[in-house]
Amino acid sequence: SLPIIYGGNSYGGYLAHLIAKIAPWHCQAILDNSCSPLPQLEYLVGRELGQGDATTLDRDLNIKLYSKTFWTCDANSKYCFTSEHYKIRSLLNAEHLKIQAKYAKDTLFISYHSAYDEFGTAKDKEKLYELYRALGFKAKLHLIKDEKELDKKFIRSLKHSLGMSDSGLFRKELPFILEKFKGKNFTQRQGEISYPCGDKIFTFKDEGEKFLLEIS
């Protein structure tokens, strides 16, 4: 069967990496453009932090927009977003990456990122890909640092997302990925992986046609 490849831009790229973390046996390659390796709290508890998901300008007003979520900073709520919830969502966790490496050293990671990304995520992305390589992952980060690297077709700017389209990303890298996997057969299998987070253990596993999360 064909390899399973996940990819995306910004948050989509983050989700692709997250799938590789919680279900490494279900993916062979990750394609990313400009994802943050760390959870962005404004998308989870932004209203309580006074940080909107986005801001829109309406004449003389800056209007902050928020996602409606169950998460809260209230320590007495069952929906309190704790450090454990943060850790399991973080890609940049050395302890978790060591566990992931036991299941996914053959997974191919390819990422593009601007060194001048306005969200300040470039250093974290460099650290993540350095850890990937140190742990034996097949990982390549294209860190765009200079305007000379802008071809105005594939990479158009040094801002977040590089002016790059998802279709452009796949057109650029998919032939390379398929060539790397040429002659290999991939079979679907069920698996299970557990990550310690503080006093909790998050276990992700296949069970029949379902993919389950158990927290103990």
Go through each PLM region and give its residues.
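Conserved acidic catalytic loop of the alpha/beta-hydrolase fold
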Residues: 1-2
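Short beta-strand immediately N-terminal to the catalytic nucleophile in serine-hydrolase-like folds
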Residues: 6-8, 33
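Glycine-rich nucleophile elbow surrounding the catalytic serine of serine-hydrolase chemistry
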Residues: 8-18
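Solvent-exposed loop/turn segments at secondary-structure junctions
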Residues: 11-13, 36-39, 116-118, 148-149
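Hydrolase active-site cap/lid region
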Residues: 18-80
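Active-site nucleophile elbow and catalytic-triad environment of alpha/beta-hydrolase enzymes
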Residues: 79-100
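Short, proline-enriched alpha-helix->beta-strand connector loops that line the catalytic pocket
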Residues: 102-109
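C-terminal catalytic histidine-bearing segment of alpha/beta-hydrolase fold enzymes
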Residues: 112, 116-216
